[in-house]
Design a protein with these regions (language model features):
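Membrane-water interface segments at the C-terminal ends of transmembrane alpha-helices
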Residues: 1-67, 95, 99-116, 120-122, ...
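Glycine-rich helix-loop "coupling/hinge" segments at transmembrane-helix boundaries
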Residues: 115-143, 176-179
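Short functional hotspots where side chains directly engage DNA or cofactors
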Residues: 87, 132, 149
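Residues in the helix-turn-helix
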Residues: 25, 86-87, 128
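Short helix-to-coil transition segments within interhelical loops
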Residues: 69-97
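Hydrophobic alpha-helical segments of integral membrane proteins
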Residues: 7-14, 84, 92, 129, ...
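A cross-kingdom feature marking charged/low-complexity
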Residues: 167-179
């Protein structure tokens, strides 16, 4: 138990490390490693660099509901003869749908806001709404800037709205799971 708890603590520290180190210095180090390995400017690597910052926030959002989940629900299903995978899909995942959707929404919001990883790791080859907003902000036309900023704001708002409404449609016949 002691080794497992120590390993868990080490993994959590590694996951939360990108939040503890200033982003510009952390990403400069990551970029240096990727340039040395010839991996900069690739789409998959850019997605992984966004995940460096998305995963800690999603873990923060999911840790409370996951730890609060009462295992007796899945244990009861297995006692009644259901396989673990079936009890996971039929019981645990539906009960954790709302936290999972909100974790996705938070992760999406964090990813939309990532400017430094997109520029440094993407080697300036990928255009996102955030990189466009930052480049347009240096220009004189505030109308275009406001339109882009509104789009940047609306994307997470749409995902949060979907996270709120999806359980109402998925569980229309289960009142307590619609909350």
């Amino acid at each position: 138990i002691g080794k497992s708890r120590h390993l868990n603590s080490a993994i959590q520290t590694f996951i939360y490390l990108p939040l503890l180190i200033p982003q510009i210095s952390f990403m400069a180090g990551v970029q240096l490693l990727l340039v040395a390995g010839g991996l900069d400017g690739r789409w998959g690597i850019l997605v992984l660099s966004h995940l460096l910052f998305v995963l800690p926030y999603t873990f923060i959002v999911l840790s409370g509901p996951y730890r609060a989940f009462d295992r007796r629900f899945t244990d009861q299903a297995m006692i009644l003869g259901r396989h673990y995978l079936k009890s996971l899909v039929r019981i645990k995942l539906p009960m954790l749908t709302r936290p999972l959707l909100f974790a996705f929404a938070v992760g999406f919001s964090v990813s939309v806001a990532q400017y430094i990883p997109t520029i440094l790791i993407g080697a300036g080859r990928f255009s996102t709404i955030t990189t466009e907003v930052v480049s347009i902000s240096a220009g004189p036309d505030r109308r275009i800037l406001s339109a882009y900023a509104l789009i940047q704001q609306m994307l997470p708002l749409i995902v949060y709205g979907a996270a709120i409404l999806t359980p109402k449609f998925l569980f229309y016949n289960r009142r307590q799971m619609q909350l």
